[in-house]
Amino acid sequence: MRNASVTARLTRSVRAIVKTLLIAIATVTFYFSCDLALPQSAAAYPFWAQQTYPETPREPTGRIVCANCHLAAKPTEVEVPQSVLPDTVFKAVVKIPYDTSAQQVGADGSKVGLNVGAVLMLPEGFKIAPEDRISEELQEEIGDTYFQPYSEDKENIVIVGPLPGEQYQEIVFPVLSPNPATDKNIHFGKYSVHVGGNRGRGQVYPTGEKSNNNLYNASATGTIAKIAKEEDEDGNVKYQVNIQPESGDVVVDTVPAGPELIVSEGQAVKAGDALTNNPNVGGFGQRDAEIVLQDAGRVKGLIAFVALVMLAQVMLVLKKKQVERVQAAEMNF
């Protein structure tokens, strides 16, 4: 009986281990198959920064890493209060303006609307406010925006997107300020806020490869001998540009669907010359701001000090008037 019980337990354990391994293998397979099947569509999403730079999205130079894939510079604005009190909810507004009539190149080469995304780097201790602390008025401004922390231990770094650009050129973040009275690691004072905002797909993947939302150049000097259009089983179109150097073998440059060819067969090109136009209409921008975590006691003290100064000035004016009246009475006497 004892041996049978031990055997049963071992059998159940083995089954559990096998089941866990199968789930893990299926998950990994699904992840990589999606990455291979749809690499261009995923490259525009902010979570690529999380995977490539897990510690922080800001380099030591101050540049936010989204600029490594979104090469064009575009304006981004941020609005935060000059100062806030502890344990209060305020809003940070990130503005990502662009021409809504513009269309970008999609993963399949078709023209589609632009998406937007943003990263908000708050000071330590600041975080997205819980739902029960958000007023109805502020909730209306937020809409259905989903805020994702950069990592489990970095609630002060928040990413958003991709979102439809036509609806979200302004993204409202509900932020809860920390309370130094309950967290001894937090101190009153001035802090920096860093913001990055992008519109449209990136031009480079985190691996360094170009996306189809980029300019393609000739890799050799010579004459374009042939331009062949190819289509794979999934219907994805690409062009093979054959360049014949003065000596040596033909060099083949592959151009995906999306950018428009601006060269033709028989045309002479030099290495580095553009084979296509630049289809990118988006870009990335970042801004820095400052916010003060204000001590309520100091604010009250400042108000009291200002009131005393004003009262002293009033008393001085009244005293001066009194002296003037006394002097006038003595002169009349």
UniProtKB/Swiss-Prot annotation:
It comes from the Bacteria. Its main location: membrane. Residues 1-44 form the signal peptide. Its cofactor is heme. It is a single-pass membrane protein. InterPro entries: Cyt-f_TM, Cyt_f, Cyt_f_lg_dom, Cyt_f_lg_dom_sf, Rudment_hybrid_motif. Keywords: Electron transport, Heme, Iron, Membrane, Metal-binding, Photosynthesis, Signal, Thylakoid, Transmembrane, Transmembrane helix, Transport. GO terms for molecular function: electron transfer activity; heme binding; iron ion binding. Binds 1 heme group covalently. The 4 large subunits of the cytochrome b6-f complex are cytochrome b6, subunit IV (17 kDa polypeptide, PetD), cytochrome f and the Rieske protein, while the 4 small subunits are PetG, PetL, PetM and PetN. The complex functions as a dimer. Belongs to the cytochrome f family. PANTHER family: CYTOCHROME F (PTHR33288:SF10), PTHR33288. This is Cytochrome f.
